[in-house]
Amino acid sequence: MKFLLLVLAALGFLTQVIPASAGGSKCVSNTPAYCRTYCHWGETALFMFNASRKCCISYSFLPKPDLPQLIGNHWQSRRNTQRKDKKQQTTVTS
């Protein structure tokens, strides 16, 4: 009984001392990024944590790029200008 209690105490202590290697540690406290040797599928490296480890973050947590907003129907207006250019070319050449 004493041996079983000693084994359980040792296992409880070891789980506190040995870090979990599968999950990785957090790189920065306010981002959902983890310090790993290799990034998982669906992740990208933000920066190198040290010489052999990267700070990996999921693509879903990356900020979306700001794209310019098109006003109105851009493709329709472009098509009309192309038609006008063709009409002007035919009238000039004939």
From Swiss-Prot:
Task: List, as start-end ranges, the regions of compositional bias called Basic residues.
Answer: 76-86
InterPro entries, sorted: Beta_defensin_dom
Kindly list the places in or outside the cell where this protein is found, as annotated in its UniProt entry: Secreted
Looking at the record, which segments are called Disordered? Answer: 72-94
Q: Looking at the UniProt record for this protein, which Gene Ontology cellular component terms does it annotate, in alphabetical order? A: extracellular space; sperm head
Keywords annotated in UniProt: Antibiotic, Antimicrobial, Defensin, Disulfide bond, Secreted, Signal
- Disulfide connectivity? C27-C55, C39-C56
Segment forming the signal sequence: 1-22
One GO BP on record is: innate immune response
Q: What does this protein do?
A: Has antibacterial activity.
Which family does the record assign?
Belongs to the beta-defensin family.
Protein name (record): Beta-defensin 132
Q: What organism, scientifically named, is this protein from?
A: Gorilla gorilla gorilla
